[in-house]
């Protein structure tokens, strides 16, 4: 019975972590020096809550690091906290475009070679 209870608690904790309800890790919370001293900027936590509900991204203004929060599959926020889906998608698109560009360059080089061969044939005649 204790084993089942501890397994459920562990699973609930992992789900909570993957959904973005993690405590702040050092420089991910922006602090501002106000009259009374340092106070945590509440807008940053609001953005984090919004991203956790929608499965979006949180960009830390202090560190400049984008952290994926929740969404995108089970436990993705727990196992890959800095995983950037948009960047991976852009890399795939760029790779595809570079393949198309290589094909274009190959065809252009072939046309250029044919023109040079034609000029050499005209000069030899």
Swiss-Prot record:
Keywords noted in UniProt: Host nucleus, Secreted, Signal, Virulence
Region of interest (Disordered), residue spans: 21-66
Record function comment: Effector that acts as a broad suppressor of cell death to interrupt plant immunity. Inhibits cell death induced by cell death-inducing proteins, including the PAMP elicitor INF1 from P.infestans.
Gene label: RxLR22
Cell compartments where the protein resides: Secreted; Host nucleus
Upper lineage: Eukaryota, Sar, Stramenopiles, Oomycota, Peronosporales
One cellular component (GO) term of this entry: extracellular region
Membrane listed as a keyword: no
Residue positions of motif RxLR-dEER: 32-50
Organism: Plasmopara viticola (Downy mildew of grapevine)
Domain notes: The RxLR-dEER motif acts to carry the protein into the host cell cytoplasm through binding to cell surface phosphatidylinositol-3-phosphate.
Protein family membership: Belongs to the RxLR effector family.
Expression induction or repression: Expression is up-regulated at the earlier infection stages.
Name of the molecule in the record: Secreted RxLR effector protein 22
Signal peptide residues on this chain, from the entry's feature table: 1-26
Keyword match Secreted: yes
Transmembrane segments: none
């Amino acid at each position: 019975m204790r084993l089942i209870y501890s397994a459920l608690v562990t699973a609930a904790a992992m789900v909570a972590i993957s959904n973005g309800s993690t405590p702040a890790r050092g420089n991910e919370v922006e602090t501002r020096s106000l009259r009374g001293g340092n106070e945590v900027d509440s807008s940053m936590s609001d953005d984090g809550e919004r991203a956790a509900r929608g499965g979006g991204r949180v960009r830390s203004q202090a560190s400049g690091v984008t952290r994926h929060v929740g969404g995108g599959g089970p436990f993705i926020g727990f196992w890959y906290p800095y995983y950037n889906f948009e960047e991976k998608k852009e890399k795939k698109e760029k790779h595809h475009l570079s393949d198309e560009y290589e094909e274009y360059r190959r065809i252009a080089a072939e046309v250029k070679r044919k023109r040079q061969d034609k000029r050499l044939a005209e000069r030899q005649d």
